[in-house]
Amino acid sequence: MHLPGRAYPMEDTDPGNWESAVVSPETVIEKIKPGMSIFLGTAVAEPRTMVRHLMTSDAKNLEDLELIQLVSFGDAVSLQSLQSRNFRLKTFFSGWVASAAIEEGRVDLIPSRFAKIPQLIESLLRPVDVAIVQVTPPSEDGFCSLGIAVDVAHEALEHAAICVGEINTQIPRTFGDTMVHVSEFDFLVRSKDPLIYFERWETDDVWDQVAQHVASLIEDESCLAFSIGPLYEALAKSLANKRHLGIHSPFFTDPLMDLMKCGAASNRRKETYRGKALTSYAFGTWRLMKWLDSNPMVEFQRIDKVFNPLVIGRNPKFVTIVAARRVDLYGRIGLHTGKGIVAAGPAEVMDFITGAELSEGGRSIFALTSRDRAGRANILLSVAAHPNQFAGFESVGAVVTEYGVAYLEGRSVRERAQALIDIAHPDDRAGLVRKAKDKKILYGDQIFLEESARLYPADLAATLATKGDFEIRLRAIRPSDEEGMRHLFYRFSDEAVYSRYFHSVSSMPHAKMQEYVNVDWNQVMAIVGLVGEEGKGR
């Protein structure tokens, strides 16, 4: 896109002779004036050669500069360099090392829904004077590819007075809205920096169990949003036998590549960008980058499309899976913070949660292990002290640990608390019950059999198929089944009540029903059958 009234120094450059137009980073730095706002390519597409020269240059004109970057990994833009008064980093992202820097006042966080960021640049609420992005060498037709991070690069290039393309031969050439003609750059700089790679996360038996429970909630033909971490590594393995999954994800990763390569994700049942995986960023190993190179099955688009809840919601059965750090008995979520976390901010999560709510058959799933690596409980009475909270706890559809699934949608606070206690670590449940009773979240007379919690026969779970493909899910009863069992009681006929309880019973309040759902597994066996959609059946 050529802006009216702007000169394009490279407009007449022969694409086949682009190397003759390459300048040194110092030449670019000379054009920067004090007080300018400089947009830097995001995350693994950070233009590290130019950034490194900016950070180390002693040029007198580099004063009071504002650096704008959606996601900063603190690689070239280090926290040490930001201690200088010459630079101030402003980011829309609260993950990775930015979380600590924001708390220390060294980085400014701009709270915003990701889908709205392009509008902030286009409306000049966040003006950009200089745009520096990393691109592939131009093709014979003169088009460079933005590679593995599209985000708002186009908007920044369209509104900047100075556009710099840092050409790196190691970037995969990707498809979608990734192309920028070489003539749109004012300067080209050569980079020999390697890409930033992420090794695959290690998983263990606990994460595998969490993933299996998450996978049980994902139907064939669902459309998925992933991030990075052990949850997603384990989940891809558990989804390998699904059919016609779709991908509409902020980040494309090695596990998503695995799902496409094994045939589980065909993208043929999606409503938007059918036949292709949709994303805006890629994070992963060199194998992923090699696979993405010139791969037409993965579509990279701007974040106002990838993060747009209305676009997301057009896909039926859209499922967003979020790795949680903590959860409390109200269903409030504490998200991850710190280095190693890419999708950490509530704003990034909320766009996809909203999209799932708009999707027919969509759902949001928050998953975590019941305890962290240090053995501390991840299910707490309250996460009020956690620094990175997801405020929309009413939008939390389900929480998953290795001990099962807590369905929260449509449930009261008391019912939520009971369901979450059921999936907490068995050694943490008695304490949670006691604290919840003290806070009047649970009934004061709530029964809890501590030893029974450790004996719960999870291996009895099975699915019974009847005529007409009608399925009944069987499992051992849980304390959180109390409300469902109470409603079932009032649907019984008098004869059914008598045959079940061997005498006439006219009512089944909490005090009575809790005795039937809190089972001593040393002496009693109680099985429930569930029909209908997971979490919404009866």
Mark where each language-model region is:
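Conserved alpha/beta enzyme-core scaffold
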Residues: H2-E450, M485
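Long, contiguous binding/interaction regions
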Residues: L455-R538
